[in-house]
């Protein structure tokens, strides 16, 4: 195992020094996980899209001088439903139109972090 996505401690990846290897923590968020948002908090599909955009706006501004990670935890069986998907699509289209944004995966964040910082 090279990395985990269990800690909500930071918007940056960070390294754990372990006896066998350097384990990377790739950021994770509970706030932008659609299952708790819809089922526990009861937000609407539109509100979830707005939450993504609002979080992005803050992190994009903060990231102007120091890059940030913004994980969005999704499950296709849930947010992939047509009544929910249109607002997710709206949020991704909003994010994608900004400069210096990398839409990526945890694997790629791990690879990038190891190349740059270890």
Name what the model sees in each region.
Residues 53-118:
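C-terminal domain-boundary segment and adjacent tail
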Residues 1-66:
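Active-site-adjacent pocket scaffolds in enzyme catalytic domains
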């Amino acid at each position: 195992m090279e990395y985990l996505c269990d800690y909500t401690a930071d918007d940056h990846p960070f390294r754990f020094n372990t006896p066998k290897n350097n384990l990377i923590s790739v950021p994770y968020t509970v706030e932008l996980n659609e299952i708790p948002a819809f089922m526990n908090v009861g937000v609407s599909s539109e509100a979830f899209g707005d939450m993504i955009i609002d979080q992005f706006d803050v992190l994009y501004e903060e990231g102007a001088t120091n890059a940030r990670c913004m994980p969005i935890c999704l499950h296709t069986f849930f947010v992939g439903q047509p009544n929910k998907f249109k607002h997710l699509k709206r949020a991704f289209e909003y994010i994608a139109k900004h400069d210096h944004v990398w839409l990526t995966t945890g694997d790629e964040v791990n690879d990038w972090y190891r190349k740059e910082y270890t």
